[in-house]
């Protein structure tokens, strides 16, 4: 294993945002959108040094002339060429490190296809010549970050949500439930319901505007029906938002109708339980003896759990499903947007973790399948 003085890199490749930095730090150094943009138009200015692709914030700032693509959908990498561009950008432009000098810890969603992590492993060793690497499960890292070894994590990002029960540090794979409903679906739904108001958002660039509206103004209602009544009778819930061209739009009940989808997936035509019921179902798949500990340690993680009011609503919904005397505690750490990364930073800097890395030598001997043996 590499010498102790070389900091490991921690890269949490989310469907929406990539969080990257150095093990031992308390926050990621680089947070940028997991976007690759390609020009929609013909370049006419000679000598401008136009690129054929842009990554992250640069793609975001030039979005008016680009087609934006997300290479990670529902937590699974669907475009490896673009993914390589994102990693290249992470190492060389954001962190400014030589990847062949640092071990790298990557993250992935539970219940991902095996081929996905094999390919990640292969690219790290063959394209970037990493000396060592490891792939960790996102939700497990969030629990590390909250300082617990037992609990159930509801991790909801941009592309995928999942509930992962963990007991004394062991994830219980039979009880993990994956829900392909997350931030991006909420953004799409917000685009749809704003269209009903007469505001048209259609392009990939406009989707980013709607995502911003969602992040700034949406919240979870404690009682949806009652909130709808309030919205009808008073304008107290209305907020205005200024679009990049200076036009001001007003949004009212969309503010809480959008995230309500998390609790009522039928809003977007999904036949699935909401996040509260999924969490409950996940707990019920666990041994009867450990359920009490899970109810009392329900940890929220990921950007889509950042809506104001979500913890209170979860508390209310799970209380109505659980046995009446059960103590239920929803833990919503303020830094939960980055708790996967923070957990990775903690894990990669533990002395006991150093023998867990997959080294280049092991990879050369066994090939990409080594990742299933060495990583949970």
Swiss-Prot record:
The keyword Hydrolase applies. Its main location: cytoplasm. Pfam families: Actin. It comes from the Eukaryota. Transmembrane segments: none annotated. It catalyses: ATP + H2O = ADP + phosphate + H(+). Keywords: ATP-binding, Cytoplasm, Cytoskeleton, Hydrolase, Nucleotide-binding. SUPFAM superfamilies: Actin-like ATPase domain (SSF53067). There are at least six actin genes in Podocoryne carnea. Actins are highly conserved proteins that are involved in various types of cell motility and are ubiquitously expressed in all eukaryotic cells. This is Actin-3. It comes from Podocoryna carnea (Hydrozoan). The gene is ACT3.
